Regions:
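Short hydrophobic alpha-helical segments of the AMP-binding
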Residues: 17-22, 28, 164
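AMP-binding/adenylate-forming
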Residues: 27, 44-56, 142-145, 153-178
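Conserved pre-ATP/AMP-binding loop-to-beta segment of ANL
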Residues: 99-102, 106-146, 153, 177-178
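Structural core segment of the AMP-binding/adenylate-forming
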Residues: 23-119
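Short, small-residue-biased leader/transition segments that mark boundaries at the very start
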Residues: 2-3
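Active-site-adjacent beta-strand anchor residues
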Residues: 7, 52-55, 137
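Alpha-helix N-cap/helix-start and coil->helix boundary motif
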Residues: 11-12, 37, 59, 151, ...
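Conserved coil-to-alpha-helix start sites within the AMP-binding
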Residues: 8-19, 34-38
Length: 178
């Protein structure tokens, strides 16, 4: 299996990368974006993902992890890019509180691949030519979620595509209108 690790807060880019990974047949290994290098090293070695899509504020941490884990490429996500235009413009105003908020949300991430470049024409198109992975079915792994490690080292729990679809069906039956 091909694995892609992800350490992102809730943001539109998070969903986009999940859909893209699954379209390619990759398994998404989710990580808490607030974890330290020590907390991430074991899980990163366990699933051996070569690509990490991460919040740009923590990109240096994953660049450091690339020295001791299989990470080969780090894609950095600027969360401000997906905000509505009014909010993006407001964050550019020279007001102290807005500058502090901007610094909380974004940091330069040299040496990484900016997420925005993945959406550019120079990357080879809009992805319409990518075919679904023929080997993916309801029993194929979709995600690896790691336990907290309260009784030892964190362990990776696999969710299959069937597990995820069952969760969607459950949600739709409990909440009308979705």
């Amino acid at each position: 299996d091909v694995y892609k690790r992800q350490a992102l807060p809730n943001c539109p880019q998070h969903l986009l990368t999940i859909f893209a990974a699954h379209k390619l047949g990759a398994v998404v290994a989710e990580h808490n974006p607030l974890y330290t290098a020590r907390e991430l090293e074991g899980p990163c070695k366990d699933h051996a993902a070569k690509v990490a899509v991460v919040w740009d504020k923590i990109a240096p941490l994953f660049q450091e992890l690339s020295r001791t884990t299989p990470i080969e490429k780090v894609v950095s996500v600027n969360m401000i890019d997906a905000m509505p235009l009014v909010k993006r413009l407001a964050l550019k105003l020279p007001i102290k509180s807005l500058k502090e908020k901007r610094e909380q949300l974004h940091a330069e991430a040299p040496g990484t691949i900016p997420f925005s470049e993945l959406q550019s024409p120079k990357m080879g198109g809009d992805g319409a030519d990518i075919q679904n992975c023929p080997d993916t079915n309801q029993d194929s792994p979709a995600f690896i979620l790691f336990t907290s490690g309260t009784t030892g080292k964190p362990k990776g729990a696999q969710l299959t595509h069937g597990n995820v679809m069952s969760n969607v069906v459950q949600g739709r039956s409990w909440i009308s209108g979705i």
